[in-house]
Amino acid sequence: MSKFVFVTGGVVSSIGKGIVAASLGRLLKSRGYSVSILKLDPYLNVDPGTMSPFQHGEVFVTEDGAETDLDLGHYERFTDTAMTRLNSVTTGSIYQAVINKERRGSYNGGTVQVIPHITGEIRERIHRVAANSNADIIITEIGGTVGDIESLPFLEAIREFKNDVNRNDVAYIHVTLLPFIKTSGEIKTKPTQHSVKELRSIGIQPDLLVCRSDKSINEGLKKKLSGFCGVNIKSVIEALDADSIYSVPLALKKEGLCKETLKYLELEDKECDLKNWEALIHNLRNPGDPIKVALVGKYIELGDAYLSVVEALRHACIEKKASLDLHWVSAEMIEKGSAETYLKEVDAIVVPGGFGNRGVNGKISAIKFAREKKIPFLGLCLGMQCAVIEWARNVANLPDASSSELNPDTPNPVIHLLPEQEDVVDLGGTMRLGVYPCRLTNNTTGKKLYDEDVIYERHRHRYEFNNYYKQSFLNSGYKISGTSPDGRLVELIELENHPYFLACQYHPEFLSRPGKPHPLFQGLIKASQEKLTQSN
């Protein structure tokens, strides 16, 4: 039977609950326990799939095609465990399920209320993850901040949850902030005391406090928090600001987070094996020469919009003992100026996914610059589509080529709508989503990098390469490195006579892990290092 850990946050938003949950997952897994982590998000959207990246950041896609919160990416990267659509729950999806049940008559004519029906549905979702994953420990992160109106149903649900199981099957962790007041030179505990008081008023007594701070917390402060918040002093965990999110598990291990959690769950504190993780942090803190990577996008004002891409680059740099020097380049600024102005000093160029016309011509200019100047290049999803358009216009004698998404009237739609998407009206959850197989072509860079005949990658798109133009592309020097097993869909392309020029229709960034970098990102960094060595 599974045990359950609930992670709440107080005082301020963006306190780091997701990293705490993911770090605890890593620590538990290092002790031999299986873990699954789910996120309860208190917004009314059914999922983040239709939300602006400026509002929500990246949409993380799971193996089974769910469009989820970016925290699920942290969960997967830290625990190296695949999550599913069950691991992402929103207020919108809960209300939708309850209303659908009411319409079907599932409540036998009863009055449908927040308590017990909404809270009951939330508890059911948590139990469903336990049943589906069969994990030893289920960690649940509750989005928002204690005191927010929209979080109340979730907090009530996790309060009720302890009645579904034995008390020693549940642990409550509250992540909070201890602000340092510069004028007085003091760390203040009062905001945390009030946050815990608010949590207690709902009926939840936290078992552990994880205290975020940029200053070290002495024993006196821990004793004070223990007394005012009713938490064992050993369960007051210091969480100092870290140099990297990947160093957080080691810091929390030192503070005893995992040991104390296991104590409340009455589970054995097994021997912890973090040798590989420690080696990872050593390489991270002792990098070699920097690699200047330009990320050319349309949402660069919010770095979280490309979170998995950045982490995948970081994983590859750690593996190759390089330092990541990331240059955020606005595709729209390239349109107003020139690609050379923004890209002449970089060692590699990445064009990530996206939607819509804005910034596309800037991306195409960046790709042309990478191709002509022999700069290692990787295109992802829309990045591949832009690479196809660039080649068609500048090499394959199709100057008016475009995508039917960007220009429905183009006479040469080298990128067109997938046939199964033609009658789709709704936006949410209707794209080609989730894992699909890709057969790699022999004697290609792609095949060499993966060293597999068939790979499985995650997708999120409606448009694809138009096979009507396949032969003209092949004749003009393009290589198709990977297709769907039936050969119908082009998934990976590359150029010969270039240090590294690959573009894929899928999202390889979702499968990159610390210590297990994705082959396409690893290949990009390696090619950049080799080019730098040759130029020196």
From Swiss-Prot:
Active site residues according to the UniProt entry: 381, 507, 509
Keywords attached to this entry: ATP-binding, Glutamine amidotransferase, Ligase, Magnesium, Metal-binding, Nucleotide-binding, Pyrimidine biosynthesis
One Gene Ontology term of the molecular function aspect: CTP synthase activity
Catalyses which reaction(s): UTP + L-glutamine + ATP + H2O = CTP + L-glutamate + ADP + phosphate + 2 H(+); L-glutamine + H2O = L-glutamate + NH4(+); UTP + NH4(+) + ATP = CTP + ADP + phosphate + 2 H(+)
Highest taxon listed in the record's lineage: Bacteria
Pfam families: CTP_synth_N, GATase
Manganese is among the record's keywords: no
EC numbers, comma separated: 6.3.4.2
Region described as Amidoligase domain: spans on this chain: 1-267
Biological process terms in GO annotation: 'de novo' CTP biosynthetic process; pyrimidine nucleobase biosynthetic process
Positions of UTP binding: 13, 188-193, 224
InterPro entries reported in the protein's UniProt record: Class_I_gatase-like, CTP_synthase, CTP_synthase_N, GATASE, GATase1_CTP_Synthase, P-loop_NTPase
Domain Glutamine amidotransferase type-1: 292-534
NCBIfam families in the record: PRK05380.1, PyrG
Other known facts: CTPSs have evolved a hybrid strategy for distinguishing between UTP and CTP. The overlapping regions of the product feedback inhibitory and substrate sites recognize a common feature in both compounds, the triphosphate moiety. To differentiate isosteric substrate and product pyrimidine rings, an additional pocket far from the expected kinase/ligase catalytic site, specifically recognizes the cytosine and ribose portions of the product inhibitor.
Membership in a protein family: Belongs to the CTP synthase family.
Biological function: Catalyzes the ATP-dependent amination of UTP to CTP with either L-glutamine or ammonia as the source of nitrogen. Regulates intracellular CTP levels through interactions with the four ribonucleotide triphosphates.
Protein name per the record: CTP synthase
Species annotation: Prochlorococcus marinus (strain MIT 9215)
High-level lineage: Bacteria, Bacillati, Cyanobacteriota, Cyanophyceae, Synechococcales
Gene that specifies this protein: pyrG
